[in-house]
Amino acid sequence: MGSFKDDREEVLQAWYMDDSDEDQRLPHHRDPKEFVSLDQLAKLGVLSWRLDADNYETDEELKKIREARGYSYMDFCEVCPEKLPNYEEKIKNFFEEHLHTDEEIRYCVAGSGYFDVRDQNDSWIRVWLKKGGMIVLPAGIYHRFTLDSNNYIKAMRLFVGDPVWTPFNRPHDNLPARQEYLEAFGQKEAANHVVDAAA
């Protein structure tokens, strides 16, 4: 008997990033590679599911998640040079480290891309989201997004109520959403970075 494998890992993988300034669309693995489990992501408040991307219109699992979490709003966003107006500018904006005062929910129905999130020690974790993967980033987590080398993702965006996509670029540690995130997920270390820099 083989060991139990989480089927989410086929559409969601995560690892610690290196510090290289090379093309942001490359994997940026450390050497040796340091993978991060989906359970570790959950401890940062990052939730994930594997869903049937070919049948999202009739998927009962998606319907249950939306009802349970109150995701009343839905639309789609295609990110690629041909489909996104002001592509270069948008991609730069997506890759600026920022937070939101609400959850960011993305369900990849085609293509793939990277969501980078900060861990408790302010290190970057790269989350590779592929077709069928759905991810929820909690309000208040510092993160950023980029395409991978395939240069294409089509994602369903979900939201509770009317959508607000306002990014607050780092630093915005004074926002209640950030304070609540730190309290919920124990990121006390992040506050010490300011002290370290001044020492």
Curated annotation (Swiss-Prot):
Stated role: Catalyzes 2 different reactions between oxygen and the acireductone 1,2-dihydroxy-3-keto-5-methylthiopentene (DHK-MTPene) depending upon the metal bound in the active site. Fe-containing acireductone dioxygenase (Fe-ARD) produces formate and 2-keto-4-methylthiobutyrate (KMTB), the alpha-ketoacid precursor of methionine in the methionine recycle pathway. Ni-containing acireductone dioxygenase (Ni-ARD) produces methylthiopropionate, carbon monoxide and formate, and does not lie on the methionine recycle pathway.
Catalytic activity, reaction form: 1,2-dihydroxy-5-(methylsulfanyl)pent-1-en-3-one + O2 = 4-methylsulfanyl-2-oxobutanoate + formate + 2 H(+); 1,2-dihydroxy-5-(methylsulfanyl)pent-1-en-3-one + O2 = 3-(methylsulfanyl)propanoate + CO + formate + 2 H(+)
SUPFAM superfamilies according to UniProt: RmlC-like cupins (SSF51182)
UniProt keyword terms in alphabetical order: Amino-acid biosynthesis, Cytoplasm, Dioxygenase, Iron, Metal-binding, Methionine biosynthesis, Nickel, Nucleus, Oxidoreductase
Pathway annotation from the record: Amino-acid biosynthesis; L-methionine biosynthesis via salvage pathway; L-methionine from S-methyl-5-thio-alpha-D-ribose 1-phosphate: step 5/6
Cofactor: how bound: Binds either 1 Fe or Ni cation per monomer. Iron-binding promotes an acireductone dioxygenase reaction producing 2-keto-4-methylthiobutyrate, while nickel-binding promotes an acireductone dioxygenase reaction producing 3-(methylsulfanyl)propanoate.
Keyword Iron part of the UniProt annotation: yes
Pfam families xref list: ARD (PF03079)
Subcellular location: Cytoplasm; Nucleus
GO molecular function per UniProt: acireductone dioxygenase (Ni2+-requiring) activity; acireductone dioxygenase [iron(II)-requiring] activity; iron ion binding; nickel cation binding
Binding positions (Ni(2+)): 98, 100, 104, 143
NADP is among the record's keywords: no
Gene3D superfamilies on file: Jelly Rolls (2.60.120.10)
InterPro entries assigned to the protein according to its UniProt record, in alphabetical order: ARD, ARD_euk, RmlC-like_jellyroll, RmlC_Cupin_sf
This enzyme's EC code(s): 1.13.11.54, 1.13.11.53
Native source organism of the sequence: Vitis vinifera
Cofactor list: Fe(2+); Ni(2+)
Gene Ontology BP terms: L-methionine salvage from methylthioadenosine; methionine metabolic process
Any Gene Ontology CC annotation: cytoplasm
Enzyme class: oxidoreductase
Protein name according to UniProt: Acireductone dioxygenase 2
